[in-house]
């Protein structure tokens, strides 16, 4: 089933072959990481580009009021019949496309385990920021953030 992913991010966190952050945050312009205008995943992931497992730094300033909180669009996934929007108050999200899933026993006995057969959108802090002295919380300090996953039937579906 074809689907597209849009992530309004101007930069991403580069990772090495072990999927560890390098500390570099390149611009997405002109790269497979440019998902600002939506990309079909079947076209984006191929022999030359093995898939996504990166943190995207959101560039959207279009805040949305939701239950008294200011949230921004982090991602939108459009399938044939359904659409999903992800809203957050964080500065980015990790996008993963099941690069390391191997054919094997089905999940829960009925969902096939297929490479690139799943995607994950996780809002939160950038991986590896503790190396930069960020992302620490004191004992007893409360940490909260808000993420909303909204799934709807596509109205423009023929």
Question: Which residue stretches match the model-derived regions?
Answer:
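An exposed, glycine/acidic-rich loop-and-rim segment of catalytic or binding clefts
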Residues: 1-158
């Amino acid at each position: 089933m074809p689907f597209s992913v849009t992530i309004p991010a101007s930069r991403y966190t580069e990772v090495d072959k072990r999927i560890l952050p390098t500390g570099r945050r390149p611009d997405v312009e002109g790269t497979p990481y440019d998902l600002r205008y939506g990309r079909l995943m079947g076209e984006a992931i191929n022999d030359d580009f093995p898939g996504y497992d990166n943190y995207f730094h959101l560039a959207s300033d279009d805040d949305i009021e939701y239950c008294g909180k200011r949230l921004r669009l982090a991602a939108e996934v459009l399938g044939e019949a359904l659409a999903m929007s992800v809203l957050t108050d964080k500065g980015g999200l990790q996008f993963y496309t099941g690069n390391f899933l191997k054919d094997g026993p089905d999940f829960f006995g009925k969902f096939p385990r297929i490479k690139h057969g799943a995607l994950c959108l996780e809002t939160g802090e950038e991986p590896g920021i503790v190396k930069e002295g960020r992302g620490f919380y004191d004992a007893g300090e409360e940490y909260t953030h808000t993420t909303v996953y909204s799934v709807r039937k596509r109205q423009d579906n023929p």
